[in-house]
Every structure is written in C-alpha cells, then in structure tokens.
C-alpha cells in the first residue's frame, strides 16, 4: 500500500510539473494585446519619475549615490537628505539638522534639485541608502 501511495504521489507530482512547463505560454497574456485592448499604456514608474525630474535630483525618490556629482554632499549630507524626507518643497531640506557649511553647500546646488511625490516602487526597503551599484 505504501509503495502504491508513493507511486501515485510521484506520478501526480510529475504531471503537475509537466503541466507547469506546458501551460505558461498559453496562460500569460501578450503585453501588446493587454495594452491595445485595456485602453491603458503599459508604463514603468521609474521611467516616468526620471522624465518628470528633468535632469535634476529628485529629493523624494533618488538614492544617496545621485548626490556624488555635488562635491561635499556625498555621503554624509546626502544620507541626511534621503532619510529626512519626504519633502513637499526643496527648501524643506533646510529644516533638517544641518551645519552652516552644509546649508551653504545645499544653497549652492539648490537649483539642481526637485521634488516629486514619493513613489513606493523607488523607496521600498533601503534602496535609497544602498542601491546595490558597486564599481
């Protein structure tokens, strides 16, 4: 009886695995058809945010690494800015506990920053502190 049960269990498992290999091609919807018939364009949130910031660093959705282009801001001040958000306005950064030197640096580069609404896809976990890009 044990042998029959183990044989049936194995056969059922193999049938399930084979079905899993065969079905995905017919189960998944074609992305072109989804976009065409749903009336919605398939969009990537990250690409939308990059387009919205117009070459500037988004204080609510950028990682610490984006501040490397501004001498003196990376990593200490950049970390404070990233952890201090979200912001409604660029000037809200001045409400953080910044030294006089850091305030001068921020004002020097202020025109290079923008604020857009925080997006969970870009802020989930600790990706803004360590986005996993290594040299």
UniProtKB/Swiss-Prot annotation:
Domain of life: Bacteria
Membrane topology recorded in Swiss-Prot or TrEMBL: Peripheral membrane protein
GO CC entries: extrinsic component of membrane; photosystem II oxygen evolving complex; plasma membrane-derived thylakoid membrane
Location of the protein in the cell: Cellular thylakoid membrane
GO biological process: photosynthesis; photosystem II stabilization
Endpoints of the signal sequence: 1-29
Keywords: Electron transport, Membrane, Photosynthesis, Photosystem II, Signal, Thylakoid, Transport
Main function: One of the extrinsic, lumenal subunits of photosystem II (PSII). PSII is a light-driven water plastoquinone oxidoreductase, using light energy to abstract electrons from H(2)O, generating a proton gradient subsequently used for ATP formation. The extrinsic proteins stabilize the structure of photosystem II oxygen-evolving complex (OEC), the ion environment of oxygen evolution and protect the OEC against heat-induced inactivation.
Family label: Belongs to the PsbU family.
Self-association and partners: PSII is composed of 1 copy each of membrane proteins PsbA, PsbB, PsbC, PsbD, PsbE, PsbF, PsbH, PsbI, PsbJ, PsbK, PsbL, PsbM, PsbT, PsbX, PsbY, Psb30/Ycf12, peripheral proteins PsbO, CyanoQ (PsbQ), PsbU, PsbV and a large number of cofactors. It forms dimeric complexes.
Protein name from the UniProt record: Photosystem II extrinsic protein U
